[in-house]
Structures are given as structure tokens and as C-alpha cells.
């Protein structure tokens, strides 16, 4: 497999746009969770990252990078769909939190693998610039979205606002998956 850099840049842009869009919703989503959950989540996150780091000799290849990237993106898609279907509850907050923790377990691996497979300084620079542009745009869109639904549509309830932004997150996440798949090509 090989990375198609132009499409990969769009994937990274959209991925960071999602992060910018979603960042404010986490605080409302996680409201039902007990603070001790975050402590245990941190312990499991550290253990998971340790386990992944010990697997580098097996998974630091482009095929594993592609599959793990897909796993992360589909995990996020599942969390969004679950929230949209089952709304707010302790179980929903916990499932979404665990989903995010699962994706974070692979964070260091994905950054290291991405750096290895991009190879060139210019490609790495372009990816980082695309990520920052996506993140900034996502935060601006998120801010605008919340302002519009609060002041133009009169929706003042934070839970309803966060529920609505999840439809944008759903479209964003589906676009991310499509672009991720398009970013890789099998070598002939």
C-alpha cells in the first residue's frame, strides 16, 4: 500500500475539522459520568498505550496503519450513531467515553506511523498545516453553529444543542472515512 498525499491531506484536514467541531460537546456529553470514571479511564488509556507500544514491531507497517486508522474512524462513527439513537443517559455517556478512549489508545502509534510513512519533511509539514486549518475551521464552525441555534432558533438547552451538532459530526465522520479509504492505494 501507499499513501496518496493529496487525498491524505484532505483526510487529515477533515479529521481535525471533526475534532474542532466536537470539542465543546464532550463537556455536555460526559455530564452523567462520575469523576472516578475519568481516573480509571486514564489508567486503562495508559495501559492500552503501553500495550500498543509493545506491539510496534508487528504493527509499524503501512497495512496495519491503514487498518488501525479505519478501526479508529469506525469507532468514532459508532459512538456518534449510538448517541443519536439513544440520546443522553449514563450508558450513552460511558459508551461514548470508552469509544474515545479506545481511539486515544492508538494516538501515539498513529502519529509515529504517519511520520514514518510520509517520509519527507515537506509532506509532514503539509499534514500539520492541514490539521491546524481543519481544527481552526472546526472550532469556528462549532462556535457559529451554537450561536445560530441559540440566538436565531432559540434553542438554549445545551443537551439539545449538542444533540443537533452530532448530525454535523455524523456527516463529517462519514466524509472522513471516505477520504481515508481514498488516501491509500495498493501497490501494483
What are these regions (language model features)?
Residues 3-18, 41, 92-99, 168:
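Alpha-helical transmembrane segments of MFS and MFS-like solute carriers/permeases
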Residues 30-41, 87-96:
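Membrane-helix interface and helix-disruption motif detector
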Residues 40-57:
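Central cavity-lining transmembrane alpha-helices of secondary-active solute carriers
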